[in-house]
Every structure is written in structure tokens, then in C-alpha cells.
Amino acid sequence: MNRIKIESILMLVAALLSQFAVSCNNHNNEPMTKNTKMEKILFINGSPNRDGNTAALAKVLLEGREYETLNLNDYRLNFYGQTLEGDQLDELIAKMKHADIIVMGSPVYWHNICASLRTLMERFYGYVPSGEFKGKRLFFLYQGAAPTKMMIDAVEYTMSRFADMYGFAYEGMATDRSEAKTLREKLESTKQ
């Protein structure tokens, strides 16, 4: 009888430790929500404002799903061609490789993608082999003071070329809450 109680307690402790380990993997204290497909989702926030409009748009897109937020402002990322110590590009790329779905987000700065996200993308060139991210889905969030059609078209072209070069399946872009809700339908669809 005591052995059955001990085994039951051990099973309960193991289940609690497992749940604790999952919650500890969320280093950014983001709300952990259920991801029905168990795909690993990484949101790369290019905004220096970690809780700003870019993050809010990600919450709309990723509503109801578990995801990790990577704030680029928390990482040292040298510009293309710099060889300064402390660069964390390898760490960023490792996190991206571990994810099934990557959502990149940028505020509109000077009619374009913000510098931190642009730097990450530029650093791929010559460092990451072509096709390295084959099979991973890429979504883009681009928000700001009413981006014009020309700005949206230019960024859409940039993102689709980036995706093509590195093997991502580019799923599209959202610039506001309504578009993020529409893009969520693609997120919820089966892998293409």
C-alpha cells in the first residue's frame, strides 16, 4: 500500500517538474499559451520598445499559441564586416534553427525595416548557407505610422528574397491588427 502511494507521489512530482521545466524555458516572462500543433515559434522583436506596437501586433498574430520572444535589443550584434568581440550572431541563429515558425517584427523607421532587424538579416549573407532554413515558416510584422504602398511593396520584396535565399517558406506580412488576424489563418493552416 505504501509503495503505491510513493509511486503516485513520484509520478505527481515528475509531472510538476516537467511543467516547471517548460515554464522555465520561457526566459522572457511572456505568457505561455497552448500551441495545438506543438510547433516551436520564435518571435524576433526588432523594436527597441519590447512592449510596444510591434510586440502587440505579434500577440494578435500569435494569440492562443505558445511562443518565445527574442528582443534584438538584448543581444550584441555587430554590423556586417565588423569583427568585434562579444558578437552573439551564433546564439541568434541557433535559436532560429530550433524554431519551426519564425515571426520577425519591425517598426517602420525611415520608411524601412529597423536597423537591428536589418543588421540580423544582413549578417546572414556569406555566413549562413543558402537554403539553411528550408522547411521553416517565416511571417513578418511591419507596423508604424501608416506605411505607404511603396514602403510595403519594398519590404515585401526584401522579405521574400531573404526567405528564398535561406529556404524559409515566406507566409506573408501584416501591418495592422486586421491583417495580423488574417495572417493568423495561414499560421493555423497545415505546413505547406
Predicted regions: what they are:
Residues 2-10:
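Bacterial N-terminal signal peptides that target proteins for export
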